[in-house]
Amino acid sequence: MKSKVSPSFHFFIFFFLFCLLRTLDYNTYNTNHNDTYMHIKLFFSYYFRFVHLFFFLYYAHLRTTKHYHTLLIQYYPFEMHWSKDLAQRPSSLRLRYFPAYLKRCCYHPMQN
């Protein structure tokens, strides 16, 4: 069964556990400190050192899967062309990024 969670989220969970194990490991080897919340402080010190990478990984995951670069393409579904040929055969970009919610209810020149 394929997971619906992004790979960056999986890495986020694994790194969370890694930070937890590092802090537990640190506490087992250093027993002379008087700080009660040393393990919590160490965990967040490990965690916030790399937390900005998770935002980048998630953004890169969205850039590669959700076609965010297509937002730069201005698409008008009811654009009137001066040429009938263009109106009947729109470019492959215009056909590919035609909105899905308009494909079901509205007319598209490539459908017939």
From Swiss-Prot:
GO CC annotation: membrane
Keyword entries, A-Z: Membrane, Transmembrane, Transmembrane helix
Topological relation to the membrane, as annotated: Multi-pass membrane protein
Superkingdom assignment: Eukaryota
Localization in the cell: Membrane
Record's keyword annotation contains Membrane: yes
Principal localisation: membrane
TM helices/strands, residue ranges: 7-26, 36-58
Remarks, miscellaneous: Partially overlaps RPB3.
Name by which UniProt lists this protein: Putative uncharacterized protein YIL020C-A
Species of the source: Saccharomyces cerevisiae (strain ATCC 204508 / S288c) (Baker's yeast)
Lineage, top ranks: Eukaryota, Fungi, Dikarya, Ascomycota, Saccharomycotina
